[in-house]
């Protein structure tokens, strides 16, 4: 059984037991969170596709940790001017473990 749900403006395909990194959520570590914006639920032969959401669909997850991703380096360069500018960015994330999928 798998589901597709939306969180932080992105869609994630998950199964029970999977660990997923989402955009940062303001939830304490160890707490349980429910995602109700479920777009699709597939259970063996049957597939429930929402229009746009599946009625009664929920994905239940447990918050494992919060952190920051690896640094992405941005370089801006002006040709012929001997000028360059370097910047870095580290995005915050929340890591969750999917415990249940309800349709």
UniProtKB/Swiss-Prot annotation:
Record keyword rRNA-binding present: yes
One Gene Ontology molecular-function label: structural constituent of ribosome
Keyword Endoplasmic reticulum recorded: no
InterPro entries, alphabetized: bL21-like, bL21-like_sf, Ribosomal_bL21, Ribosomal_bL21_CS
GO cellular component terms, A-Z: cytoplasm; ribonucleoprotein complex; ribosome
Keywords of this entry: Ribonucleoprotein, Ribosomal protein, RNA-binding, rRNA-binding
GO biological process, one term: translation
Domain of life: Bacteria
Pfam family of the protein (one): Ribosomal_L21p
Job description of the protein: This protein binds to 23S rRNA in the presence of protein L20.
Protein family (similarity comment): Belongs to the bacterial ribosomal protein bL21 family.
Quaternary structure, from the entry: Part of the 50S ribosomal subunit. Contacts protein L20.
NCBIfam families linked: L21
The name this protein goes by in its record: Large ribosomal subunit protein bL21
Gene it is expressed from: rplU
């Amino acid at each position: 059984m798998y589901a597709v749900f939306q969180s932080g403006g992105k869609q994630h395909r998950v199964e029970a037991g999977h660990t997923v990194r989402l955009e940062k959520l303001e939830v304490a570590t160890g707490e349980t969170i429910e995602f109700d914006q479920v777009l699709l639920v597939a259970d063996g032969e049957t597939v429930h596709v929402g229009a746009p959401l599946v009625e009664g669909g929920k994905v239940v997850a447990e918050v494992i940790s919060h952190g920051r991703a690896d640094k992405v380096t941005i370089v801006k360069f002006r040709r012929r001017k001997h000028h360059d500018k370097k910047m870095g960015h580290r995005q915050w994330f929340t890591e969750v473990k999917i415990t249940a999928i309800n349709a």
